[in-house]
Amino acid sequence: MRIEVTIAKTSPLPAGAIDALAGELSRRIQYAFPDNEGHVSVRYAAANNLSVIGATKEDKQRISEILQETWESADDWFVSE
C-alpha cells in the first residue's frame, strides 16, 4: 500500500512539520495495519489531497480517519524547534 499526502503550498507549515507529519502518520498507520509495508510520503503540491494506492475502500476510509486524527492532534506530537 502506498500513501501520499499533499499539502497546499498556499498553507505553509512550520519548519520540520512535513517530516514530523510523515513520521507520525507512518507510525499510526503501521499500528493500524501491522502487516502493511506501505510507504507514506508527505509533500507540498497545488492542493490538499490524500492518495492511497493498493488498498480496499474500507482501508482508504480508515487511513483518511487516521490522517484526520493525526492532523488534529499535532499539538501532542509536533515540537517546533
UniProtKB/Swiss-Prot annotation:
GO BP: DNA repair; SOS response
SUPFAM superfamilies: DNA damage-inducible protein DinI
Domain of life according to the entry: Bacteria
Keywords assigned by UniProt, alphabetized: DNA damage, DNA repair, SOS response
Entries under Pfam families matching the protein: DinI (PF06183)
InterPro entries with a match to the protein in the record: DinI-like_sf (IPR036687), DNA_damage-inducible_DinI-like (IPR010391)
GO molecular function: enzyme binding
Similarity field: Belongs to the DinI family.
NCBIfam families for the chain: PRK10597.1
Function: Involved in SOS regulation. Inhibits RecA by preventing RecA to bind ssDNA. Can displace ssDNA from RecA.
Protein's name according to its UniProt entry: DNA damage-inducible protein I
